[in-house]
A protein has these predicted regions:
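Residue-level signal for well-ordered alpha-helical positions
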Residues: 16-17, 48-51, 88, 129-130
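Short, well-structured N-terminal submotif of metal-dependent ribonuclease cores
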Residues: 1-38, 53-65, 121, 125
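General small-molecule cofactor/ligand-binding pocket signal
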Residues: 36, 75, 132
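Charged phosphate-binding loop/patch that engages nucleotide di/tri-phosphates or the phosphate backbone
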Residues: 111, 115-117, 121-134
């Protein structure tokens, strides 16, 4: 199965953070799965690290190096991914989800027929079977 990992999932995995549950670690470690990261995550990390290096110690380059060293596959940003954001539908009465990085990565997963692994409750409120909530 193909899994696109949300940025925080990757950070937790790289740092050994216990917030990443065993089920998620097992999916990532399972060699029958293809593990992907988005170029969107590299952008998100670089923007957030540059703005607040005291809150996010990893920069985009180190993040990218970790992904490549582990053999994760990069998902580039395509026009189709961007334009499909308009088609995202929230569940009834779900509060707004304003994170543009998350929305773009969810669209990448949908367009590329992947599961989007996340811990974010707001992402799980989209009407799609692409979300793999951990």
């Amino acid at each position: 199965m193909k899994f696109l990992l949300d940025t925080h999932i990757l950070i937790w995995f790289f740092s050994g953070d216990e917030q990443l549950i065993q089920r998620a670690r097992a999916v990532i470690a399972d060699e029958s799965n293809e593990i992907y990261y988005s170029l969107t995550s590299v952008l998100e990390i670089e923007i957030k690290h540059t703005a607040h290096p005291d809150r996010l110690s990893i920069d985009g380059e180190r993040f990218l190096n970790h992904c490549q060293r582990l053999g994760f596959i990069q998902v580039p940003i395509k026009t189709e991914h961007i334009l499909s954001i308009r088609n995202l539908v929230r569940k009834e009465n779900a509060p707004p989800h304003r994170d543009p990085f998350d929305r773009l990565m969810l669209c990448q997963a949908i367009v590329e027929d992947m599961k989007f692994m996340t811990h974010d409750e707001r992402i799980a409120e989209y009407v799609t079977d692409a979300v793999y909530k951990v």
